[in-house]
C-alpha cells in the first residue's frame, strides 16, 4: 500500500518527500549563536526512518522529510545540545512554524511508541461473514471515504478518538468477533479494493471494533527510498487490517485510539 489515504487533490501521499533544508523557506530565523527553546506545533508527529526525520502533519494533511543536516540539528535540539549552526539548518522549520519558540525548556515530544507487530491476528481461511457484517463493512468504508475526502485529518483523528473513549474495553470473544469483521472486509474487497485505500479501511474497521468494545490502535507508518506511507489497525502486536507482510516494512510515525 503506497498511500495513507484515498484522497485525490488532498491526498497525504501526494506530498512527495520534502527536503526541508537551510535554504528552504523565505523567512530567516534569528541569527543568534544558540537556539532558543522550541516545541513542536500541535498536530505534528515525527519518526526517524532510514536515518532521516519524517513528519506527519495532521493540520496540513501531508508528510515531509528533513535533509540530513537538518535531521542532525533537529535531534540535537531535542536533546538540548544545539550548535550555533543549527539555527540556519532549522530555519525552514521555524519559518513554517513547525517549531514554535517557548519561554522555557520543556520535554521534547517523542515519536510514536507502538508495540512491534509480530503477525496478522486473523489468518485465512476466514470464517463466512454474516450479512449484517458485510453491510457494515461496505457502509463503514463509504462513510469514512467521504470524511477522508472532505475533512482535515486532524478532525478525523479527533472523531475516532472520541468514539474509542466512549466504548468500554472488552476481551470476551474479541478474537472471534475480529475474525468475523475481518472476513467481511475481505469479502467486500472485490468491489471495494484495498489498494490505495488503507486509511479508509483501517478507519472503518477501527470504528466497528470500538462499537463491539474492542480497542485497537490506528497506526500510520512510513518508509524511504522511495517514500511510501501506510495505515493499519493493530491490537497489541497483531495486525487486524493492513497486512503484516507490508506493515513490517514501515516505521510507525503516529498511533491513535
Sequence positions of predicted segments:
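Short aromatic-centered micro-motifs
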Residues: 57, 233
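Long, charge-rich, low-complexity alpha-helical segments
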Residues: 2, 49-52, 59-155, 160-167, ...
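N-terminal secretory targeting and juxtamembrane "stalk" segments of secreted and cell-surface proteins
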Residues: 2-27, 32
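Long, low-complexity, charged/polar intrinsically disordered regions in eukaryotic proteins
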Residues: 24-51
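Residue-level recognition of alpha-helix initiation/capping sites
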Residues: 84-85, 200, 224
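A short, glycine/Asx- and small/polar-enriched loop/turn
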Residues: 226-230
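Short, well-structured beta-strand/strand-turn elements
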Residues: 212-225
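Secondary-structure boundary elements
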Residues: 124-197, 201, 207-210, 234-235, ...
Amino acid at each position: 500500500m503506497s498511500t495513507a489515504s484515498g484522497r485525490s487533490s488532498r491526498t497525504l501521499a501526494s506530498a512527495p518527500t520534502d527536503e526541508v533544508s537551510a535554504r528552504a523557506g523565505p523567512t530567516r530565523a534569528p541569527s543568534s549563536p544558540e537556539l532558543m527553546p522550541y516545541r513542536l506545533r500541535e498536530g505534528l508527529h515525527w519518526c526517524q526512518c532510514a536515518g532521516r526525520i519524517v513528519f506527519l502533519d495532521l493540520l496540513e494533511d501531508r508528510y515531509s522529510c528533513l535533509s540530513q543536516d537538518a535531521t542532525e540539528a533537529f535531534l540535537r535540539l531535542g536533546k538540548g545540545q544545539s550548535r550555533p549552526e543549527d539555527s540556519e539548518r532549522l530555519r525552514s522549520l521555524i519559518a513554517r512554524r513547525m517549531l514554535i519558540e517557548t519561554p522555557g525548556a520543556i520535554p521534547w515530544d517523542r515519536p510514536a511508541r507502538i508495540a512491534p507487530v509480530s503477525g496478522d491476528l486473523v489468518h485465512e481461511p476466514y470464517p463466512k461473514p454474516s450479512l449484517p457484517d458485510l453491510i457494515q463493512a461496505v457502509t463503514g468504508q463509504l462513510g469514512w471515504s467521504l470524511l477522508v475526502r472532505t475533512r482535515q485529518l486532524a478532525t478525523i483523528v479527533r472523531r475516532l478518538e472520541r468514539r474509542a473513549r466512549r466504548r468500554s474495553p472488552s476481551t470476551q470473544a474479541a478474537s472471534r468477533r475480529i475474525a468475523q469483521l475481518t472476513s467481511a472486509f475481505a469479502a467486500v474487497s472485490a468491489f471495494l479494493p484495498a489498494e490505495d485505500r488503507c486509511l479508509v479501511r483501517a478507519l472503518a474497521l477501527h470504528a466497528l471494533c470500538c462499537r463491539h468494545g474492542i480497542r485497537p490502535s490506528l497506526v500510520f507508518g512510513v518508509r524511504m527510498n522511495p517514500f511510501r506511507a501506510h495505515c493499519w489497525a493493530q491490537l497489541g502486536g497483531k495486525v487486524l487490517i493492513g497486512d503484516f507482510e507490508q506493515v513490517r516494512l514501515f516505521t510507525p510515525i503516529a498511533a491513535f485510539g
